[in-house]
Design a protein with these regions (language model features):
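Outer membrane pore-forming secretion/assembly proteins and partners of Gram-negative envelopes
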Residues: 2, 22-209
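Twin-arginine (Tat) signal peptide motif
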Residues: 2-8
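Bacterial N-terminal signal peptides
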Residues: 8-19
Length: 209
């Protein structure tokens, strides 16, 4: 009888241990996927209709109004991507929101002279900060763009003026960390001679399975 009770207790202990191991494996951060969101916000002093930004960016907008001199802000683009914990992220595209911003600022970007953009993160990783809060670390964060700027005009044989362009590089590289689902300002990039700027905002959180 005692032997049977001992075997039953051992079996129960093994089952509990297996369940705890499986639960630990399911919550292992190494198995997690992360959803990253990169927001491109345009700051301008031009008289334009200011569009409503997402409620999730209210804190960011309040911070921008307190620290930057722009009259208006609008959301130019939102880039959403999914990446495995401790994985890397690479994006590149032609044209898009920077084309319209640089075109308005300098008469530059067009289908013939588009802008070129890229967004890279060497590693996206879940961590714990000193307060034991879950944070997302982005190592090797890099955003860059090549934007056409009109510098002069060449006179053709028929008298028409053909504009000349130079491509200017702009971008930011850094390492950052943030609490999950909390947008943070990474940096600002001046675009063209008008004084307009692109403000980079990023957030990240665990993606649903």
């Amino acid at each position: 009888m005692k032997k049977q009770m001992f075997l039953s207790a051992m079996l129960l202990a093994l089952c509990l241990a297996s369940g705890l191991t499986a639960q630990a494996q399911n919550t292992d951060p190494d198995d997690a996927n992360l959803e990253t969101q990169l927001y491109l916000i345009v700051g301008t002093n031009q008289d334009v209709d200011e569009a409503r930004l997402p409620a999730s960016l209210d804190g960011v907008v309040k911070q921008l109004r307190a620290s930057l001199p722009f009259k208006n802000y609008r959301l130019a683009a939102t880039l959403i991507n999914r990446v495995k914990n401790e994985g890397r992220l690479q994006l590149s595209w032609i044209g898009g929101p920077l084309a319209s911003v640089s075109g308005a600022a300098s008469g530059g970007a067009s289908p013939v002279t588009p802008s070129f953009s890229q967004f890279n993160v060497r590693q996206v990783k879940l961590q714990r900060n000193s307060e034991n809060q879950s944070v997302v670390q982005m190592l090797g964060f890099n955003f860059g763009a090549r934007i056409p700027i009109q510098v002069s005009g060449a006179i053709a044989a028929n008298g028409a003026v053909a504009p000349n362009f130079n491509y200017e590089n702009t971008g930011v590289s850094t390492d950052i960390s943030m609490r999950e689902s909390e947008p943070v300002i990474v940096g600002t990039l001046n675009v063209g001679p008008s004084g307009d700027a692109i403000i980079l905002v990023v957030s990240a959180k665990r993606a649903p399975k």
